[in-house]
Structure formats: C-alpha cells, structure tokens
Design a protein with these regions (language model features):
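N-terminal hydrophobic/helix-forming segments and targeting peptides
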Residues: 1-351
C-alpha cells in the first residue's frame, strides 16, 4: 500500500534506476516487504547529510506458531506466542482477526485477511466466566491471564464422513478447519511452517467521543507516527538537504533481525543512493551518515488524570496540545536511553 501511494507521487524503485540521480529525484527501497526507505534528493551533496524521519510499523500483537493447529475436547485452537509488550488480560473475549501470508514451497505467496469484513468470521481467546473465576481474580494483573492461555479458538464443528472425513482421523474439528483452509487458501497443514500469521483486534479505526475529538484504533504505536512521517515526506518539495523517511519492522522486540534497525538496511540503501549518483566511496557514506540529523518518531503517553500517580506532571505530555519532543527515554538511571544534546534540541525547536 505504501509503495503504491508513493509511486503516485513520483517515487521510483532504487533498483530500477538507470543513470545518475540528481536533485529533485525521488527513490525508495524495500527490505523483505517489511521495511521501506524513501529519499528525495536535495541540492546539497549527500555527504553533507540528510534530514531523516524514522518510525516503526510493527505493533504489539499475538503471533501464530509454526506447528499451531490442534484439537482439545472438540475445540480447535491455534497455538500462539505474543509479540512485544502486551497486557495479556486485554486480549481475551475480544473479536480478533487473522492477518499475514502463507508462502508455499513453490514460492507462491498467499495473503490472509480473515475477520475484517462485515461477513467474515472472527476469532477469540477465551476467559473464565465470573462465576468460576474466584481464584483467578486473586492473581496479579500480570498473571491473571498466562501467555500459554492465549491460544486462539478457531473452530468447533467436526468434519463429517460424508464431507470427506478419514475413518482414521481422530481430530474431526481440526480436520474441518484444515478443509476450510484448503478450500479457501489451497493450504496444507505443513504450510504453517512457512507462514507468518498475526492475530490483532478486529475492526476499523473509529472516532472516539461525542465531539469526535479522538481516534480509537489498534496499532497507533507506532503507525500514527509512521503515517504522519510518510505524508510529511510526500508533502515536502525542493529540499536543500536530501530528505529521508525510513519505516521499519521489529521495534517492539528490540529492533532485531534483518528488517529491524540493528540491521544495515539504511546504511546499505544510502550507499546505493550515493553509488547511483556516480561518486561512491566509503568515506562519502560515512560522512553522509555522520552529518545527518534524525527524528525518531514514536508515541508518547499523554497525562491521564485517572492514573495521575503514574506520571511526573511537570514533564508530562498533555493530550491535544501539539507535538511531543522527548530529550531522552530509558528507565531508572536513563538505562538504555538516547539522550539528545541541547544544541540539537534547540535546532529542532527553531524549526
């Protein structure tokens, strides 16, 4: 979707570029379908640095494991593993949708999206009814729903013999689920091994409040910043310094892996941009990165008067009062923090 949108605005895939890039050119590169970097070439040499906006496009969710489908007491489930920091108790008894891809051994990619259309089925993670939850209610919030209890209820109707049930098949409900997946997605059970399926709350974003002053939606961390960063990039024109917007994966689990910021996707892509200008050198790449200025765009917590004890009010952000700039993050003694220097903050505020 992002690629289609930016191509309408004149962006071209960097790998398709023939000839030398010049000021005003717009290019992009995609990493494994999960991260994207966009560049608008400025009038100044790239080695003088770029203005970079960065955001992440993954959100906390529940992932389906690689051998997930099982039956227990005539109920079919998908075995799961939660992704990122979640409050597990928030994910039970909600309508849930299944998104992702199935990649078959022949390389065929089948997209999966079940639970978002009005006539789609939805899924659920079950919970105890209040009448049986006496002991459960005594537990801490962190333990009231355990990670192993987040398996997704996906079916309960058994496959009948006249519908093709094998006489030796003991798990008729599981067999029926697989029949449906085969009919709709041409999927075999072993295809789960090379699938990436994600469980998220079902439903569209909605206006919140009688005055419609707020937006209620899944995934605002950090897609609200990714969306605005993308459109800021599309709106900018005639830049002096090269502009860059990078939207990446895997932030919620530490920015690891080939599509997270710990990989060298940005550095490699900048190297390709310099090379496409016909003047590549390692020194120019290092100078381009050293002289660049970046805003890491992520969400912040707005002051909530119902939970005032969780905030330091004098330094807190307040809802609906404009942009939030964090000089530093981290915990306790600024552990794991990136502490921006005062000169850079002053430059940002002047802008």
């Amino acid at each position: 979707l992002t690629v289609k949108e930016i191509e309408k605005k004149g962006y071209r895939n960097l790998k398709d570029i023939k000839g030398s890039l010049k000021a005003g050119d717009k290019v992009y590169a995609v990493c494994m379908g999960k991260s994207i970097a966009m560049f608008q070439i400025g009038k100044e040499p790239l080695e003088k640095g770029m203005n970079i906006l960065g955001a992440h496009i993954d959100s906390p969710r529940i992932d389906v494991k690689q051998n997930p489908l099982y039956e227990n007491e005539n109920l079919a489930y998908l075995d799961t593993h939660y992704y990122g920091g979640i409050k597990k108790y928030q994910w039970v008894t909600l309508p849930l949708a299944l998104h992702g891809v199935i990649v078959k051994t022949d390389g065929t990619v089948q997209k999966v999206n079940i639970g978002e259309k009005e006539d789609d089925p939805v899924f659920v993670v079950t919970d105890l009814l209040i009448h049986l939850a006496g002991k459960q209610m005594e537990k801490k919030a962190s333990a009231v729903i355990e990670g192993e209890k987040l398996d997704l209820l996906i079916g309960s109707r058994p496959l009948e013999k006249e519908e093709g049930l094998d006489e030796d098949e003991k798990d008729a409900v599981k067999a029926n689920v697989m029949k449906i997946l085969t009919d709709y997605y041409n999927m075999e059970e072993e295809d789960f091994l090379s699938a990436e399926l994600e469980i998220v709350p079902a439903g569209k974003a909605r206006d919140c409040g009688l005055d419609r002053s707020m937006i209620l939606a899944y995934g605002q961390d950090d897609r609200v910043c990714a969306f605005t960063s993308l459109f800021a990039m599309l709106d900018v024109e005639d830049v002096e310094r090269t502009s860059c917007c990078i939207l990446v994966d895997k932030e919620e689990i530490g920015s690891v892996g080939a599509t997270g910021m710990h990989a060298h996707f940005l550095e490699n892509t900048v190297a390709e941009v310099i090379n496409s200008q016909g003047e590549y050198s390692e020194l120019k790449l290092r100078r381009a990165l050293k002289n660049s200025k970046m805003l890491s765009a992520d969400v912040n917590a707005g002051y909530d008067p119902l939970y005032a004890e969780a905030f330091e009010k004098r330094s807190a952000a307040f809802f609906g009062r404009g942009l939030v700039f964090n000089k530093f993050t981290g915990a306790r003694g600024k552990s794991g923090s990136n502490d921006a220097n005062a000169e850079y903050l002053a430059e940002v505020f002047r802008a």
